């Protein structure tokens, strides 16, 4: 159990180092990749998640919503549900702190130069028009999560013991969902990806912080992925007949 928890923590932290790190690269003043755009960021997220699976194995979830889905289909015991979720959330927080420390000089150089909201969005997902149409944003995030988790569970069923194939498939799934559906909410699909770094942004010594938008964070990336995950698990198990 301890080894599994450490793998969840380590894989999630590494994922967030890749993810928050690439947003630091594209947003902050003085980085070599400033202004590289969303295509660059989404591709890095995708490859980074594949790397995490290469290192820690295909059994890691790195995502409380995925933990819930795997509990529903019987891949993860219900007794492991809360511990795995907590390990993922802690990994998300620590990974964001590591990324901030790596880019601390660039954060300092960006003070008064880079928009505070853009700096906040390095850490967390936020909608295109902030604070409006929560129902639409919730629906979009739930649909993204449904497609994301359904595809991963189906790929895992078909890949069997081939962890390398599964890792590549997951990266492609992240890339496709991000490019095709992520432009509205930023496609969190994962509380550890959003709320973990959002908590880190709350406590890190970054000057001129924007409002952390907790109302949106707790409702949309906080709850919607669980809804999408449950529907995905029922679809994969009940309709596709897997697991």
Q: Where are the predicted features?
A:
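Membrane-interface helix-loop junctions and terminal tails of multi-pass membrane proteins
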Residues: 1-243
């Amino acid at each position: 159990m301890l080894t599994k928890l450490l793998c969840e923590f380590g894989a999630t932290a590494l994922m967030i180092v890749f993810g928050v790190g690439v947003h630091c690269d594209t947003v902050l003043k003085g980085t070599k990749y400033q202004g590289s755009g969303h295509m660059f960021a989404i591709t890095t997220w995708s490859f980074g998640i594949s790397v995490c699976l290469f290192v820690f194995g295909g059994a890691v979830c790195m995502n409380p919503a995925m933990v819930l889905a795997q509990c529903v289909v019987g891949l993860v015991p219900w007794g492991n549900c809360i511990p795995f979720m907590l390990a993922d959330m802690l990994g998300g927080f620590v990974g964001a702190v590591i990324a901030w420390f790596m880019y601390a000089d660039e954060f300092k150089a960006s003070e008064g130069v880079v928009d505070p909201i853009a700096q906040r969005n390095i850490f967390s997902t936020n909608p295109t028009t902030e604070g409006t149409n929560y129902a639409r944003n919730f629906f979009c995030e739930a649909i993204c999560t449904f497609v994301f988790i359904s595809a991963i569970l189906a790929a895992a069923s078909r890949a069997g013991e081939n962890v390398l194939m599964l890792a590549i498939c997951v990266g492609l799934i992240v890339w496709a969902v991000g490019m095709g559906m992520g432009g509205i909410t930023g496609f969190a699909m994962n509380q550890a990806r959003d709320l973990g770094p959002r908590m880190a942004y709350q406590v890190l010594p970054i000057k001129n912080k924007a409002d952390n938008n907790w109302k949106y964070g707790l409702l949309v990336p906080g709850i919607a992925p669980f809804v999408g995950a449950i529907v995905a698990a029922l679809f994969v198990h009940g309709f596709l007949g897997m697991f």
